[in-house]
From Swiss-Prot:
The modification N-acetylalanine is found at A2. Belongs to the 3-hydroxyacyl-CoA dehydrogenase family. This is Lambda-crystallin. It is an enzyme of class 1 (oxidoreductase). It comes from Oryctolagus cuniculus (Rabbit). The lineage of its organism: Eukaryota, Metazoa, Chordata, Craniata, Vertebrata.
Length: 319
């Protein structure tokens, strides 16, 4: 068995995101401590991780060079936070998206960690200035926002507090790369970070197009899944522009006036209520009934698709 990577990693919270982070860090050879205040929660989490890793190994989708058993041997549980922080180089907070709860956790960590550990939050929308301001170790704090499901979607948004040191950002970026993720540096905090701002822009226009009777809900989704989404799985919108003409300058010269004309026709922010909600809900429930069994099955299918796509992207040589 290969030697563990230098330093331990602590995961605070053993839900879906916490389990995913534990698997990712173990795949990179790190010893992982999984902390939760509820022992039964940790027991269930470890069993879930074991089943998932065995399944991934059988399908050839397990990350890292270690076997499932070797990775599992790197993951341990703990219920004492003061003991859990001993020897760790990185702490990844994964508790529910509640500002008061997260601030409480970071206040506890702030009082027991040294000056070397990185304090990282998995928050999807809470600004670092709300989470970390006032902490003694604020220079060591950063948001590392994963995308659900983190094991199959490698993007991680790194969002620093205004007082976060450049060294903390660099260390976290290098760590994410080491465990096979694709970190991006959000240079300054902004509500929604980058991914959700792009996602909400798409959702907003999609909603307006359905609301105004331009396209049906099912066809709207098809535009993304069988159109834009196929390109965006491999190249982003800016490179798409670059390739759709003789470079970026050519694209802007050719198409900027048309883009501005269309953009001026965009409407106001939708209310996401009323008749359109019923229309969209009816279309979605026709495709996937909104009961636990059907939703779980569809999520499983989605994750299988993402698993295969991730495998394909790993196999393809980046240009």
């Amino acid at each position: 068995m290969a030697s563990p990577a230098a330093g331990d990693v602590l995961i605070v919270g053993s839900g879906l995101v916490g389990r995913s982070w534990a698997m990712l860090f173990a795949s990179g050879g790190f010893r992982v401590k999984l902390y939760d205040i509820e022992p039964r929660q940790i027991t269930g989490a470890l069993e879930n991780i074991r089943k998932e890793m065995k399944s991934l190994q059988q399908s050839g989708s397990l990350k890292g060079s270690l076997s499932a058993e070797e990775q599992l041997s790197l993951i341990s549980s703990c219920t004492n936070l003061a003991e859990a922080v001993e020897g760790v180089v990185h702490i990844q907070e994964c508790v529910p998206e509640n500002l008061d709860l997260k601030r409480k956790i970071f206040a506890q960590l702030d009082s027991i960690v040294d000056d070397r550990v990185v304090l990282s939050s998995s928050s999807s929308c809470l600004l670092p200035s709300k989470l970390f301001t006032g902490l003694a170790h604020v220079k060591q704090c950063i948001v590392a926002h994963p995308v659900n499901p983190p094991y199959y979607i490698p993007l991680v948004e790194l969002v620093p507090h205004p007082e976060t040191s450049p060294a903390t950002v660099d260390r976290t970026h290098a760590l994410m790369r080491k465990i096979g993720q694709s970190p991006v540096r959000v240079l300054k905090e902004i509500d929604g970070f980058v991914l959700n701002r792009l996602q909400y822009a798409i959702i907003s226009e999609a909603w307006r197009l359905v609301e105004e009777g331009i396209v049906s809900p099912s066809d709207l989704d098809l535009v993304m899944s069988d159109g834009l989404g196929m390109r965006y799985a491999f190249i982003g919108p800016l490179e798409t522009m670059h390739l759709n003409a003789e470079g970026m300058l050519s694209y802007c010269d050719r198409y900027s006036e048309g883009m501005k004309r269309v953009l001026k026709s965009f409407g106001s922010i939708p209310e996401f209520s009323g008749a359109t909600v019923e229309k969209v809900n009816q279309a979605m429930c026709k495709k996937v009934p909104a009961d636990p069994e059907h939703l779980a099955a569809r999520r499983e299918w989605r994750d299988e698709c993402l698993k295969r796509l991730a495998k394909l992207k790993r196999q393809m040589q980046p240009q």
